[in-house]
């Protein structure tokens, strides 16, 4: 990207309006330009025919619409798409589209790698490099919308839902994520309703409080354990923000909208968090919480110490929660044949921590000493 030019994908509508006014342009031009970029999907200013030649020339000199580069695209047997996107810095992130009969969900990344270290997630083993810019986040939506349209020659609105559940912890990139979600919900851009944009967090309490004040999007919490002792192992940020704080906030998160509920995500790990006593503990934990629970069959990745719970175990767990009035569903595994399922996204990360090197060392050890059983704790790879 030309360092002298501003990338317009970093601007929401109001910011774009202010930018054009600073360039001595009429405010109404912002709406036209915003729609060209996001609704029509045009990057070439020369093709924005209702802007006027003088403005088009000015935009060509001062601005650009720079996107991540698609370096690979895979399509699963079930129709799931996964794109590997190269950033200007050389790192790569992944974006996934999951088609269903009446909806299409785009799973969007927020960081290069992840700043957290959940023990059951492949992204965490890649380490962390940096936060994504607003342009790199909304650029995933822009690219997916164009790719899906171009592939079958239609211009139907295929992306009906966006989930901030890709690589990274969204709330540790608060400003850029909120800015991108605002563009997603803008009627001049992608026009998604607040109930169709979901942010998933591991429980960064201060930023959850901020999000509640400034954004109406749906909230999902990566819970995965019903006690602090177990969650400390699976989701280490729990040591800083324990369940008592997390559940207290979730109880009042949608207090002004009593019909809305917090979704609690719970990965099913064989013999770890899937036993009847865990279900009983979860029922007690979520008492009086406006909640729905999403059970996620574990999706394996190299060197993981975990296994997926059996279908019978998952069904029994779900049924027990349902009998106690907790709305519970089991997420259908999609895209696992191309490593696009929940917890499998990895990308290509130039790790600025030592986490990926430690993980690779452990992987090498497991290959060279098959006689030694390798047990990995979250502390060892933090």
Swiss-Prot record:
<feature type="binding site">
    <location>
        <position position="200"/>
    </location>
    <ligand>
        <name>S-adenosyl-L-methionine</name>
    </ligand>
</feature>
<comment type="similarity">
    <text>Belongs to the radical SAM superfamily. RlmN family.</text>
</comment>
<feature type="binding site">
    <location>
        <position position="118"/>
    </location>
    <ligand>
        <name>[4Fe-4S] cluster</name>
    </ligand>
</feature>
<dbReference type="InterPro" id="IPR007197">
    <property type="entry name" value="rSAM"/>
</dbReference>
<feature type="active site" description="S-methylcysteine intermediate">
    <location>
        <position position="342"/>
    </location>
</feature>
<feature type="binding site">
    <location>
        <position position="299"/>
    </location>
    <ligand>
        <name>S-adenosyl-L-methionine</name>
    </ligand>
</feature>
<dbReference type="InterPro" id="IPR040072">
    <property type="entry name" value="Methyltransferase_A"/>
</dbReference>
<feature type="domain" description="Radical SAM core">
    <location>
        <begin position="100"/>
        <end position="336"/>
    </location>
</feature>
<keyword id="KW-0411">Iron-sulfur</keyword>
<feature type="binding site">
    <location>
        <begin position="168"/>
        <end position="169"/>
    </location>
    <ligand>
        <name>S-adenosyl-L-methionine</name>
    </ligand>
</feature>
<comment type="function">
    <text>Specifically methylates position 2 of adenine 2503 in 23S rRNA and position 2 of adenine 37 in tRNAs. m2A2503 modification seems to play a crucial role in the proofreading step occurring at the peptidyl transferase center and thus would serve to optimize ribosomal fidelity.</text>
</comment>
<keyword id="KW-0808">Transferase</keyword>
<dbReference type="GO" id="GO:0051539">
    <property type="term" value="F:4 iron, 4 sulfur cluster binding"/>
</dbReference>
<dbReference type="InterPro" id="IPR013785">
    <property type="entry name" value="Aldolase_TIM"/>
</dbReference>
<dbReference type="GO" id="GO:0046872">
    <property type="term" value="F:metal ion binding"/>
</dbReference>
<feature type="binding site">
    <location>
        <position position="114"/>
    </location>
    <ligand>
        <name>[4Fe-4S] cluster</name>
    </ligand>
</feature>
<dbReference type="InterPro" id="IPR004383">
    <property type="entry name" value="rRNA_lsu_MTrfase_RlmN/Cfr"/>
</dbReference>
<dbReference type="Pfam" id="PF04055">
    <property type="entry name" value="Radical_SAM"/>
</dbReference>
<dbReference type="InterPro" id="IPR027492">
    <property type="entry name" value="RNA_MTrfase_RlmN"/>
</dbReference>
<dbReference type="GO" id="GO:0030488">
    <property type="term" value="P:tRNA methylation"/>
</dbReference>
<keyword id="KW-0819">tRNA processing</keyword>
<dbReference type="InterPro" id="IPR048641">
    <property type="entry name" value="RlmN_N"/>
</dbReference>
<feature type="binding site">
    <location>
        <begin position="222"/>
        <end position="224"/>
    </location>
    <ligand>
        <name>S-adenosyl-L-methionine</name>
    </ligand>
</feature>
<dbReference type="GO" id="GO:0019843">
    <property type="term" value="F:rRNA binding"/>
</dbReference>
<keyword id="KW-0004">4Fe-4S</keyword>
<protein>
    <recommendedName>
        <fullName>Dual-specificity RNA methyltransferase RlmN</fullName>
        <ecNumber>2.1.1.192</ecNumber>
    </recommendedName>
</protein>
<dbReference type="GO" id="GO:0070475">
    <property type="term" value="P:rRNA base methylation"/>
</dbReference>
<dbReference type="GO" id="GO:0005737">
    <property type="term" value="C:cytoplasm"/>
</dbReference>
<keyword id="KW-0963">Cytoplasm</keyword>
<dbReference type="GO" id="GO:0070040">
    <property type="term" value="F:rRNA (adenine(2503)-C2-)-methyltransferase activity"/>
</dbReference>
<keyword id="KW-0698">rRNA processing</keyword>
<keyword id="KW-0479">Metal-binding</keyword>
<keyword id="KW-1015">Disulfide bond</keyword>
<feature type="active site" description="Proton acceptor">
    <location>
        <position position="94"/>
    </location>
</feature>
<dbReference type="GO" id="GO:0000049">
    <property type="term" value="F:tRNA binding"/>
</dbReference>
<keyword id="KW-0408">Iron</keyword>
<feature type="binding site">
    <location>
        <position position="121"/>
    </location>
    <ligand>
        <name>[4Fe-4S] cluster</name>
    </ligand>
</feature>
<feature type="disulfide bond" description="(transient)">
    <location>
        <begin position="107"/>
        <end position="342"/>
    </location>
</feature>
<dbReference type="GO" id="GO:0002935">
    <property type="term" value="F:tRNA (adenine(37)-C2)-methyltransferase activity"/>
</dbReference>
<keyword id="KW-0489">Methyltransferase</keyword>
<dbReference type="Pfam" id="PF21016">
    <property type="entry name" value="RlmN_N"/>
</dbReference>
<keyword id="KW-0949">S-adenosyl-L-methionine</keyword>
């Amino acid at each position: 990207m030309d360092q002298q030019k501003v990338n317009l994908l970093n601007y929401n509508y109001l910011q774009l309006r202010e930018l054009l006014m600073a360039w001595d342009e009429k405010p109404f031009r912002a709406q036209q330009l915003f729609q060209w970029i996001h609704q029509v999907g045009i990057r070439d200013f020369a093709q924005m025919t209702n802007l006027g030649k003088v403005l088009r020339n000015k935009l060509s000199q001062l601005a650009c619409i720079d996107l991540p580069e698609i370096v690979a695209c895979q399509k699963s047997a079930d129709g799931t798409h996964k794109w590997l996107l190269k950033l200007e810095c050389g790192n790569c992130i992944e974006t996934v589209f999951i088609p269903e009969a009446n909806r299409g969900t785009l799973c969007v990344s927020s960081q290069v790698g992840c700043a957290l270290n959940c023990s059951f997630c492949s992204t965490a083993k890649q380490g962390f490099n940096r936060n994504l810019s607003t342009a790199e986040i909304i650029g995933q939506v822009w690219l997916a919308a164009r790719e899906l349209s171009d592939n079958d020659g239609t211009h139907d609105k295929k992306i009906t839902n966006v989930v901030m559940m890709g690589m990274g912890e969204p709330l540790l990139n608060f400003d850029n994520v909120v800015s991108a979600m605002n563009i997603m919900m803008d009627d001049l851009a992608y026009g998604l309703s607040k109930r169709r944009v979901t942010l998933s967090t591991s429980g960064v309490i201060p930023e959850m409080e901020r999000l509640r004040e400034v954004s109406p999007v749906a909230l999902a919490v990566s819970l995965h354990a019903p006690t602090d002792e177990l969650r400390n192992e699976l989701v280490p940020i729990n040591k800083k923000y324990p369940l008592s704080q997390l559940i207290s906030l979730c109880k009042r998160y949608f207090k002004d909208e009593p019909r809305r509920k917090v979704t609690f995500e719970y990965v099913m790990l064989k013999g770890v968090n899937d036993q009847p006593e865990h279900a009983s503990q979860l029922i007690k934990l979520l008492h009086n919480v406006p909640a729905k629970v999403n059970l996620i069959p574990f999706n394996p990745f190299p060197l993981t110490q975990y296994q997926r719970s059996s279908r019978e175990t998952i069904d029994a767990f779900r049924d027990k929660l349902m009998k106690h009035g907790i709305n519970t569903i089991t997420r259908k595994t999609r895209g696992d044949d191309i490593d696009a399922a929940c917890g499998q996204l990895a990308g290509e990360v130039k790790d600025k921590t030592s986490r990926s090197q430690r993980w690779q060392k452990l992987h090498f050890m497991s290959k060279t000493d098959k006689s030694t059983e390798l047990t990995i704790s979250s502390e060892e790879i933090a």
